[in-house]
């Protein structure tokens, strides 16, 4: 009986000690996740934007081979570059908000569930010890 009652406080302290590092790893994980979001969004947007100008340049180059070709590439790249910079400025802000908010909610729900489970386990453990004793 004594050994069983002594094991309960140890599990309780382990739960507390585990909850603190989890919070640290969660914040670190959020930072790395937001960075990966930025990179993935930038990569997907840059690929899609690089494909669209290439498809536009080929027909313009084929149709306007009489000398307009030199004018069209000179006038078209500056606005395209400007659009890319605008996307790169806006894209990191959006995913961080979307990525972090749901994660925070999920983490909070997970922590509440673990606390409830710990209480249930302790209650079941107490009832088992009472019935056996």
Curated annotation (Swiss-Prot):
Motif: Nuclear localization signal; annotated at 110-118
A GO cellular component annotated for this chain's UniProt record is: nucleolus
Name the tissues where it is expressed.
Answer: Testis.
List the GO biological process terms: acrosome reaction; penetration of zona pellucida; positive regulation of protein processing; sperm DNA condensation
Localized where? Nucleus; Nucleus, Nucleolus; Chromosome
Q: Which InterPro entries does this entry report, sorted A to Z?
A: TP2
For this UniProt entry, what is the primary localization, expressed as one broad class?
Answer: nucleus
Q: What does this protein do?
A: Plays a key role in the replacement of histones to protamine in the elongating spermatids of mammals. In condensing spermatids, loaded onto the nucleosomes, where it promotes the recruitment and processing of protamines, which are responsible for histone eviction.
Q: Indicate what this protein is called per its UniProt record.
A: Nuclear transition protein 2
